[in-house]
Amino acid sequence: MICRVDYGSNDEEYDGPELQVVTEEDHLLPKREYLSAAFALSGLNSRASVFDDEDYDEQGGQEKEHVPVEKSFDSEEREPVVLKEEKPVKHEKEASILGNKNQMDTGDVQEELVVGLSEATLDEKRVTPLPTLYLEDDGMVILQFSEIFAIQEPQKKRQKREIRCITYRDKYISMDISELIEDDEEVLLKSHGRIDTHGKKTDQIQLDVPLPIRERSQLVKSGIVRDTTSESREFTKLGRDSCIMGELLKQDLKDDNSSLCQSQLTMEVFPLDQQEWEHLILWEISPQFSANCCEGFKSGLESAGIMVQVRASNSVTEQESLNVMNSGGQTQGDNNNMLEPFFVNPLESFGSRGSQSTNESTNKSRHHPQLLRLESQWDEDHYRENGDAGRENLKQLNSDARGRLSGLALQDRDMWDESWLDSIIWESDKDLSRSKLIFDLQDEQMIFEVPNNKERKYLQLHAGSRIVSRSSKSKDGSFQEGCGSNSGWQFNISNDKFYMNGKSAQKLQGNAKKSTVHSLRVFHSAPAIKLQTMKIKLSNKERANFHRPKALWYPHDNELAIKQQKILPTQGSMTIVVKSLGGKGSLLTVGREESVSSLKAKASRKLDFKETEAVKMFYMGKELEDEKSLAEQNVQPNSLVHLLRTKVHLWPWAQKLPGENKSLRPPGAFKKKSDLSNQDGHVFLMEYCEERPLMLSNAGMGANLCTYYQKSSPEDQHGNLLRNQSDTLGSVIILEHGNKSPFLGEVHGGCSQSSVETNMYKAPVFPHRLQSTDYLLVRSAKGKLSLRRINKIVAVGQQEPRMEIMSPASKNLHAYLVNRMMAYVYREFKHRDRIAADELSFSFSNISDATVRKYMQVCSDLERDANGKACWSKKRKFDKIPLGLNTLVAPEDVCSYESMLAGLFRLKHLGITRFTLPASISTALAQLPDERIAAASHIARELQITPWNLSSSFVTCATQGRENIERLEITGVGDPSGRGLGFSYVRVAPKSSAASEHKKKKAAACRGVPTVTGTDADPRRLSMEAAREVLLKFNVPDEIIAKQTQRHRTAMIRKISSEQAASGGKVGPTTVGMFSRSQRMSFLQLQQQAREMCHEIWDRQRLSLSACDDDGNESENEANSDLDSFVGDLEDLLDAEDGGEGEESNKSMNEKLDGVKGLKMRRWPSQVEKDEEIEDEAAEYVELCRLLMQDENDKKKKKLKDVGEGIGSFPPPRSNFEPFIDKKYIATEPDASFLIVNESTVKHTKNVDKATSKSPKDKQVKEIGTPICQMKKILKENQKVFMGKKTARANFVCGACGQHGHMKTNKHCPKYRRNTESQPESMDMKKSTGKPSSSDLSGEVWLTPIDNKKPAPKSATKISVNEATKVGDSTSKTPGSSDVAAVSEIDSGTKLTSRKLKISSKAKPKASKVESDSPFHSLMPAYSRERGESELHNPSVSGQLLPSTETDQAASSRYTTSVPQPSLSIDKDQAESCRPHRVIWPPTGKEHSQKKLVIKRLKEITDHDSGSLEETPQFESRKTKRMAELADFQRQQRLRLSENFLDWGPKDDRKWRKEQDISTELHREGKVRRAYDDSTVSEERSEIAESRRYREVIRSEREEEKRRKAKQKKKLQRGILENYPPRRNDGISSESGQNINSLCVSDFERNRTEYAPQPKRRKKGQVGLANILESIVDTLRVKEVNVSYLFLKPVTKKEAPNYLEIVKCPMDLSTIRDKVRRMEYRDRQQFRHDVWQIKFNAHLYNDGRNLSIPPLADELLVKCDRLLDEYRDELKEAEKGIVDSSDSLR
C-alpha cells in the first residue's frame, strides 16, 4: 500500500488503491512538502536498501549506563508498549493531524509523543491492545491508537496544497530492480531484516515517527536522551554514494551470535517489483479491536500514512531519523538483557496473522516506494540534536500538549495483538565497516570515462581497461556497436537498434554478413606507438634485405674507416672502438703497449661479459692474440676492433610469464623497449611463404592470432570445444552456417582455419610440428648468444592486405613525410631546445627545404649557434606538445612507407626509374612495334606487381565485397608462388574500345594471321566440298560427313573448332581455330567461375603449407642431408663474407679458390651495388666518427655543446682530415694534365627534387660546413641527376666575342680592352655559320668522335708537374690543335667509359650530342671557407661530360668537344688574351640531358713596371709549365675535396665559419658589430680567392724570369699593350687573316719603340699596389677575424652615442678597403697610418671604459706590420712603378 503524506498543511488525503508511484521528479520538490528522510532511513535501516545513502551498520562508540533509567524489562512479566483494541478499523477515512487555529512545529509533536511513550505505557502491569499517550503531570489521555484506525471513510480535502507531487505508476512498474541487484546481493536482501542487538542494562525502544520539520528546528530528546553521553551520541555515517547492501560482502561483520546468520538465511525478502503487494492491502476487513483499548491515543498518525517502527537500539541519536525514546517500557530481566526483535507493520492489521505471516508481510512491505522517496530528501545538517534545546522544548510540550493534540482523531485500532513484538528488529551494537569500492584499471571488461587531460593520456597507455572520453572519437569517426549500428555516442545508450526501420536493419545485417564479425582490435606496445623501434631512414642494405634481414656473423671491415683512421688525431692515449657483431659499439682509451687481454677487460665492463669468458677480437680481418700488445700487432689509433663472443648461454626459464598482477598484452604490457625481448614469455616462429610479402610489421607491433571454425550445421557445438583446448591458436571465432568465409577461399563446414591478423593484412597460418631438437638462438645488441625453447612454429600463407601501400609521388606520401618529421621534431623538443638544420635535411632528405621551413616555422625559429651553424630553436611560446602526437603517425604508416621503399629499391636494380599509371601501360604497349613488345612487357609486368599497385587493387575490390573478386586476375603474373599456389592481385585490364579492336583485326588481316573470334572465317560461306575437306582435317569419318547437310556440317565445324581453341589449340590459317567462336558468359557465371578458381588455389595453398602426416617418419639420413646442405650453404656465406667486397679482395679470393677447389663462379657486383655499399660505408663511418669524437666527460655530464655539430651523432669539424675518394673515379691523360673533368657516377634513382633557396652569398661560394653537407654533396653528385635551369644571363650575347652568357663590358670576356691590331681570331659558336644558330641559343654541345682507333686505357694515371712540362714543351712546337683526354664515367647501366675533350682553334659541330641533368657548375676557382684557401678547379675547363643513357650512346666511349686554345706561337700578351672563356650550356633534351660546362677566363694580374717578355719558345714553355703547375695544384685541391666528404678546414680557417654568426651575436649583445651585407661578403670571398691564386702565379713567374735572365745575361723590359675594345666583326675573320695578323703583331711588338705611337698608359704601379693592399685588408678581415671583428665596420651611433664626440678621425677596415679600391694610397706608409688610426681611436675611446678592446687594436697593428713586411718586395716594386709613371708623365 502506498500513501502520500502532505505535512505542509493541516489536511491529509488518502487516494485509495489507484495510487501513483514515486518518481525521480518527487525529489525536486521543496523539503517542507514531504516527509523528512529521517523517518525513511529509520524505517529502512535494518533492510539496507540498494538506494540507501547512509550506512547505519557501522560500529558505534562504547555504550555506557544511563542513570535516568530505573526500570528494565522482566523476562517473565513484560508490559508491551502497544495496546490492543477491539474496535473495527476503516482504512478509507482520514483525520486531520493539526487544527486550523494552532499549528505545531516538528519539535512540539515529537515532544508530546516522547512523553506519552515514556510515562504512560510502562506503568501499566497488564497487557493493553494498543498504546495510549498520557500527560506526565495529570495523567490525562492525549492520544489513543484505537481512534486512529476508527475512521472508515476518507474526508474531503479542506484546502489545496501548495505543491503536489504527481507520480506515474507505470513508470515505476517499468523499473526492473532485479536488473540492479546481483546474485550475491540477493542473500543480503533476504537476510538484512533481522539484526540482533546486545544491550547491557538499558535497551531503548525507538519509535521512528516522521513529522514535519522546518529548516531551523531542532530535535527534542527526553528520558535517556537527556543523559546520554557524547560517546553514545556519535554514530558512524557513510557518504551519500555508499551502498549498505554490499557491506556484508566484505565479511567484516564480527558477531558471535549464531542466530544472526540463521535469521538472515531463513527470512525471505523479495524486491518490491517481484511481489504483488497490492493484493495484501486490506479493505474494510480489519479485525475488531478490544474494548480495553486506551482512550488516550487520539492522533492522526495513521491518517498521515506513517509507518511506525519500534525497535531497540543502544544508540541514542541518529541524525537522519527522529528517535523517540521510551524509558518506561523497559522491564527488569534476570538473565536476559536483550529484547526480542519485533517489527510494526502499519499497512495491515496486527491481529489478522500470526508471527510468521506478519514477518513475511512486513518484509514484503519494506521496499515501499514512498520510503525510497523520503530517504533521499534527508539532510543531516538540519537535524542536529541539542540536549539543552530538547529540555526547553519538552517543557513547552508538556504545557501545551493538550491543546495542540485535541484535534487528532482516531482511525485504527489494530494493535492489540502482541504477536507483532516478535517482528521487532534489534540493531546490533557492532557496526559494519565501510565497504571499499575498487576500480580495477587492468580489468579489460571495464570502461572508464575520464576528461580530456594529461591523466587520460597516461591511463590509455598503461591501463588494461578501456579509457574513453566523451569528446574523443575513433580514427574512423564512429564507434561500432555489437548490434551493428553507429550511435551518436560511444556506448550507444539510446538503443538505436530498436528504432531502426526494416530496410536499414536489413542493410546493416547484410554488411555485417560480409565482414562476419571478425574484426579484432589490435594493440601495439608503447615503444611502437611512439615509433621508438622504427628507423627514420633505411640504408641500402636494409632495403635490399627488407624481407629477409641479413645478420652479420663475420667481422666486416669498413674501407673508409681504415683509410681515415690514420688521419684522425693520434696524440696522447690511443682510442679504439670495440664493436660487437650485434651492432653495439663502445669507445675505449688504451695505451699502445697494453695487451689485448687488457683491452678485453676494459671492454667487458661496457659490453657486459665476464672477463673469464672466452671472446675473440678481430682487426683488419685477423684475430688478435691475447699475449701480444696492440703495437706489436699493428693496431692503429682510432681503429675499429670487432668483438666476437662464442659462448652460448641457456635460458631454461624463458617460458615463464609475468605475474598475476601484470598484464600480458598491450597496452598494459610492453611499456618499455627492454620488455620487447625473448628472455621471457612464449615465442612463435612464423615464416612467410611469399618471397616478398606486401607488408611486414616492425618490432613492438601487435597481431591477433585467431581460429575460425565453420559450423557444419546450426546445431554444431564443436567450436565451443575448441575454445577449451590448449593447443588452439588465439581466440576462436565461430562462423555460422550462413556466414561467408573471411578468406578468399572457403572454409569447409566442420573445419577450422587459423590466421594472423593485423591492421595491415590478414593471412592464414598453418601450424607445424615442432621438432624436439629445434631451439632459437638469440643474439643481443652486445653480442651475447643465448639459446631458448620455441613454443610453436607456423607457416604463413599469402597476405590479404587491409590497407593500401603508399605510392611514390602521391599526396599520402607527402603527408606522411611531413607528419613523420613533425612527430620527430615534437619528441625531440621534449628533451632539447635546438635541432640542427642539417639533421632534418639528412634524416628527411625526401622533403624539400621549402617544405621543412614551412612546417618548422610553426614551432621554431631558424637561428645560428655559437659555431655558426644553422639550427632550429624551439619558440618560447611553443611549450605545448600536441596531445595527439601518438596518432600523428601510426605504426602501420611506417610499415607502408618502408614497403614502398623496398619496392622502389627492387625496381632500381631492375633498371626501372620512371613510373606511370597502370592504366596507361596497356595503351603504351599497343602502340609499340612487335620487336619491342617483349622488353616493354617485362617492364609493364614489373610495374603491375609493385606493392602499391597490388595492395590498391585488392583493397579496392575487397571493400566492395567478395563478390567483386572477379575484377582481379586471380591467376597470372601477380601470383607470388609462380606455380598456381597463390592469388594474383593484379587488376584485370579494361576492355579495349571498338576502334582499337577493329584496328587489331585489320592489322591481323594484313599480316595474314586469323583471329580466334571467328569473325574473319565464317564456316557458313564454305561450300559442301570445302566443308567436307575441313571436317576431314578434323578427323571426322567420311561416312558421317556424307550423311550431313550443309547446315549440319557448318555447326560441326564451329563446335569442333571452338572446343579445340578452348583447350589451347594453335591458331593458324590451316588450323581449326579460325572457325572458333568465343563463349560469352553472364556476370553471375563470371562470379561463379572466379569463385571456383579461388577455391582451387586456396585448396592447393592449404595442402602445400599444411604439415604432412609423415613428417615425424623422416629418416635420419634425410635429416642429416638437410643439415649437411645447411652447413654447406652457411660455409658459402661465410666464405663470401670473408672474401670482402672490393676488387682486389675478390681477385685474391678467386685465386685462392681456383688453386684449392678448382673453378668457382662468383657473381661480380654491379656498379650500382658498389655505389650503394660505398654509401652504406659512409653512413657507418659517420657513426664511427661520432664514437671517436665524443668526449666521455661531456657525455657523462650531459653538457654537449650543441646539436649543431651535425646530426647530434656526427663528429665535430676536424682540420686534419685527408680527402677520400675511390681511385678509379679520377683518371687523367698525360697529354692534358691541366684539364680536369669533374666526374661522377650517375645512378638511376627516383628524383626527389628539393626546392632549395640560397642566399646571394651562397650562389658563388659553395660551403661545406658539416659532414652531413659534405656527404649530401657527394651523394647528390654520385647518385642523383638534377635538371639544370637556364639562368637569365644565358640570354646575353657578347658584342665583342659573340659568346653567350656575358656582355662585352665583362672583364672575363676574352676581348675585354684588347688591342685591335694584336687580337687573334675569336672562338665562338657562330663561327661556322656566321650567326648564332638555334642550337647555340639552346646551349647544345656538339661532340665529335675521335678517329683514333686506339682504345683509351681503363685506369689512367696521374700527371706530375714534370710530365706536364714535357707535354707543354712538345705541344708548344706545333701551332695546331692538341687533343686532351679526360675520363668520365658514363652511367648507362653500370659501364665506365671515357670521354675526350678536343682543344682546337675552331669549333666543329657534329652529330653527337651530350646532354646533362646536373646543375650549373662554375669552373672559376671558388674559395672554400672550410679549407681557407682557393680551390683551383680548373684554369680553363671544368665540369662533367655525362652522355645519355641510351644503349647506342653507351656503346661509344669517346667524344670530343671543341674548346678553343690559343696559338702557342704568339707572345705572352696574345696568349693571355686568347685564354678561352666559354659557357657551354647543356642541351634542352627531353629525356637525357647532361651537365653544363663553364670555361671561364682567369683574372689577369701583372706588373706593368717590368719589362715585356720576349716572344721566344722559352716563354711558351714557361707558359705551359705554369699551366701544368696550376693543373697539378688544382688536382690536389680537388682530391682533398672529393676524396673525403668529411673535409674540415684548418684550425684558423674555422673562424671564417664563425664570421657569418658574428654580426648576429654582436647584435644580440648590443656591442660594436652588425651584420655583413650578403652581397659584399660574397664579393670579398671571390676577390680574396682570385688575389691569392694569382699572387702565387705571379711569384712563380717571376722566379722563372729571374733564372732566365741569369742565363741570357740581358734585361727584359716588361710592359703591357693597351687593350682596346674589339669590333663586333672581329670574330668573323678567316684563319689566314688571323695568321697574317699574328705575324704583324709580332713585328709590331719587336719594333714598337721605333714605329708604334705612344699608347695611353694605365696606372700600372698604382693598380699593383692596390691589389697587394687589398689582399692585406682581406687577410685582416677574414683570416684574423678573431682580432679584427670589432673594427670591421664603422661604429654606429646606436652602439656608441658619444663616439664621434671623442674620436674626431674614425677609421675601420671597410673604410680602408674602399680607399684601397679607389687607389688613394700612394705608398705603404699611408696605408699603415690608417691602421694605426684604428689603434689610436681604440685607445682614445676605450681606455677606462672597455679594457679588452685596446689590446685587440694593438694586435691588429702588429699583424698588419707583419703582412707589410711579408709583401715587402712586391710593395717596393709597385711603389717604384708609381714613381716611374709620375716621372714619365712629367
From Swiss-Prot:
SUPFAM superfamilies: Bromodomain, Ubiquitin-like
Keyword Nucleus applies: yes
Major location category of this protein: nucleus
Bias (Basic and acidic residues): 61-83
Domain Bromo stretches: 1656-1774
Tissues expressing this chain: Expressed in roots, shoots, leaves and inflorescences.
Composition skew (Basic residues), residue ranges: 1303-1313, 1397-1407, 1604-1613
Family that this chain belongs to: Belongs to the TAF1 family.
Coiled-coil regions listed: 1591-1620, 1752-1786
One annotated GO molecular function: RNA polymerase II general transcription initiation factor activity
Phenotype upon loss of function: Plants show reduced acetylation of histone H3 in light-responsive promoters, decreased chlorophyll accumulation and altered expression of about 9% of genes in young leaves.
tRNA processing in keyword set: no
Keywords recorded for this protein, A-Z: Activator, Bromodomain, Chromatin regulator, Coiled coil, Nucleus, Transcription, Transcription regulation
Annotated segments matching region Disordered: 54-83, 350-372, 1303-1382, 1397-1471, 1596-1634
Assembly behavior: Component of the TFIID complex. TFIID is composed of TATA binding protein (TBP) and a number of TBP-associated factors (TAFs) whose MWs range from 14-217 kDa.
Localization (cell): Nucleus
Gene Ontology biological process terms from the UniProt entry: response to light stimulus
Domain spans labelled Ubiquitin-like: 574-650
Protein name: Transcription initiation factor TFIID subunit 1b
Gene name of the encoded protein: TAF1B
Domain of life: Eukaryota
Gene Ontology CC terms, in alphabetical order: transcription factor TFIID complex
Record-linked InterPro entries: Bromodomain, Bromodomain-like_sf, Bromodomain_CS, TAF1, TAF1_HAT_dom, Ubiquitin-like_dom, Ubiquitin-like_domsf
